[in-house]
Amino acid sequence: DYLIALGLTSPFEGNGNDTQAAQEMALDRIKQLSAHEVGHTLGIAHNFAASENERASVMDYPHPKLTIVNGEISLEGAYDKGIGSWDKHAVAYGYQDFASISDEQEGLAKIVVKGRNAGLAFKSDTDTRSSRHGSSNGHMWENGDDPLDAFDHISEVRRLALDNLGLNTLPANAPLSSLENALVPIYLLHRYQVEAVAKQVGGLVYEYERKGDYTTPQGQTFVAPQVQQRAMQQLI
């Protein structure tokens, strides 16, 4: 992450050597990863749909959330701090105490309904990890609730970073050949968002539905035709 941050910001112009933002981004990623692994020790599965709910879970694989401010790439808030609303929901479901079995069944059902009413989405490994899976949501290493808009944004960030990549990316006395180390992750910065876009083509919209969740089962539908067409245009 530190290398990516340097490639995004190229902070060594002239005598410049302010890498504070890059260091903070890298440390925030380590903190997020630590919380992620603690979540696994608690038995919580990956939730790759969390990035579509305002980064609702540390159990996602997060891509740094990058912004452009006054024509420059900002690393502020690249990684979220603390646990998210999905994490609290999962812990409440898994660790809440109830006085009796009947109370437990009723209480757990209420927790599920509360999470659904809050708009919390969940997709885990079996439906999302491979590019062959048909789910149109729940992607690794991406951001936002609209993968096509997110692709346009990360492509603009990538273009700006590549335009600035050069001598200012390297600290003093660094070998020029080491520029390739920063080039590769920046050149491929949009690669995971491309996968999210590709899954819109012929992709399915569905959730993990149980009997009784809805008056009429929701089932599954295909991604809207206009969304699929836009996705194909982006891929081309």
Predicted regions and their residues:
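Active-site proximal loops enriched in glycine and acidic residues that flank catalytic Cys/His/Asp
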Residues: 30, 46, 50, 63
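Catalytic Zn2+-binding segment of zinc metalloproteases
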Residues: 38-52
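Metzincin-family zinc-dependent endopeptidase catalytic domain
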Residues: 1-41, 64-68
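Conserved catalytic/binding loops enriched for acidic/polar residues
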Residues: 20-21, 51-236
